[in-house]
Amino acid sequence: MRILSFVILSLISWAATAQNAPGFYWVQFSDKNGTPYSLDYPQAFLSERALQKRQLIHKEITEQDLPVNPTYVQAVLDSSGGSLHHTSKWFNSMTVNLSSLDSATLELSLAKINNLPFVVEVKNTAASNKELAVEKRMNTDTETAVDWSEPSSTPYGKAFNQLDLLSIPRLHEAGFKGKGVHVGVFDVGWMFMSAMHAFDALREEGRLVMVRDFVNPLQPDVFDGGDHGTTVLALMTAELDSGRYLGAAPEANYYLFQTENVSSEYRIEEDNWVAAAELADSLGLDVINSSLGYSTFDDSTMNYTYADMNGHVSRASQAAQWLSERGVLVVCSAGNSGTYPWYYIHAPSDAEKILCIGATDSLGVDATFSSHGPSSDGRMKPSITCQGRRTYYPIQQDAIGRGSGTSFSAPLITGGMACAMQAIPNVDNQLWMEWVQAASTQADNPDYHMGHGIPDLWWMLQKNTPGLDKLPNFQIQSIYPNPTSSQLNVITTGAPVLGWQVSDITGRLLVSCYFDQSWTRNYLQLDVSDLPQGSYHFTLMTTEGKSTSIFLKDLE
């Protein structure tokens, strides 16, 4: 999605007085001397969940975790006449809103801030709100409503293929739907969400734990501004009855953090992202989804270059790494610039120690729009991929929409990982990253288009969970198109094939085929045109055991 807005923190600072338009300014402090907070009492600024995460990953609490000295903050406000937008403990900084000042007063206020003994520098991070008139650039295709009134024979409806590509239905069948897992969503807004029945279960079950507006903290309203976040959230948790739709993690707990201004692209959105990341850490969230990105801005002097995509220039990228180092799994969209002159990933997906998610189509083929790696310092990007082209999600009036973008592939991974976290609690987030990449189709031969490939989350669980049966040394790599009206293609890996069976959802055998000699090719093609509409199990039999996948039969 281009939301993939882009912000940059250059290593070369520009003077705040170089831009005279009133707006928002980032103020860097020199130290935390005299702070009322102490490392001896972290309960004052970290929740019990956050403290437990630090113990799990053996991460010490350091001075970087101490909140900004409130005396410094108040001194900036008193000297400038501005209002507080955010503070950042990790950067030891604050963002001050000076948009109400005229130009002459602004120059005087900036001079006063710069003269404070504990201020290192001041940087312009956004223009005044009244100057924000540029339309937001969204990294998605135009939404297309789908006429779909007939119920499905599975709970997933049109979402089945995009979930099955990751083996998420198998996690659900085993009882893992994200229950008890805490998921943060950083996005542009959740317009229309309040009126959509797809989120009834989320509200009624009390799993919408927190909403926070980092764009307009003085007049918060996350249910305004844009509906991109609504789509992202729907991919994870939406539920419509009669088998019309089910998201990737329909039982997880969700925290909605609005970090994007729908009308503009300025670096202040990185300030918002950093503030959201620090709150996610303080709350002890398990995983966050950021279907956002930063590279170019409405003010071209703020633009990044590809050389900046090294994880250490963008403040959002730095914060993403620090959040990960504090035990939170960070999932970021790679970007949708694959067909543009800038075809690389965007911040914060260039960060170290995070999952950067690319996009494929429904058959697992690389989507051309998906941004490429590597990071500018040569690290593998993207990390993994899944369906982001023509993904399905609920929209207004209980209709089903369809759109494309890495904004849509990332939440499928986030939701799937939430289900896995329910299955294996208290696992180091870096270990999760190792496991999911090792369980992907290109684990042994990653590239800069699909990274390690498409993960099989069920196989990942079986491989790493004591007490679950191990998979044999083969798997059905892909079964497509799914749904199908006539022809079914099956790609296999591993052991020679002895035969196959198709049965209905009750287990009743409908058709089977056995080979006189082992089938050593990894491709099968079946004609299923005579099957009635419905859900079926395809079972592959090899010299080492059986493997089963679900497919849907549609009418012509």
Segments (PLM) and residue ranges:
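Substrate-binding/access-modulating region of protease and related hydrolase catalytic domains
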Residues: H172, K179, E239-S242, L256-D350, ...
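Protease zymogen maturation seam
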Residues: K112-H182, S194-A198
